[in-house]
């Protein structure tokens, strides 16, 4: 053995640790385009200074239409997302929910720290609050015997409502061409 003691110094090179994210739920509105925000995609990384650089869509939307802007590093406008497309920011993703649907919409994503994607994919759920849809109607014909009073009822009017709400009132927009139309309890009276 040597007469003196020596110090052996070992240096370690840092390696990138993959980032993580978390499942999240955001609120949207029926029949309304929803653009996501950066805050909708949680990002955590033990490597100091790392930040989210990409979001990759791994499983497509369960319903509706998910679109990507400037996907895969390009400069194109809004296009349909396909599996494994990535965007640089949460604001580069938007969802058009299915018409008249309040169903939750889910898709899966991974986050990237500039070097690697997260090891796991996470689910983003968009809930939708209902909005009242206007009812629809159509022209209708009521047959009657000449010189006989007609009393109209709700069933005489073609009516449809996507929420299933029963007819509440009728608004006359054009007056009769012949005869006398009388209203009972008009204007809420």
Labelled PLM ranges:
Residues 24-28, 140-143:
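Short beta-strand segments of immunoglobulin-like
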Residues 1-17, 29-35, 39-51, 61-135, ...:
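Acidic, turn/loop-rich segments in luminal/extracellular domains of secretory-pathway
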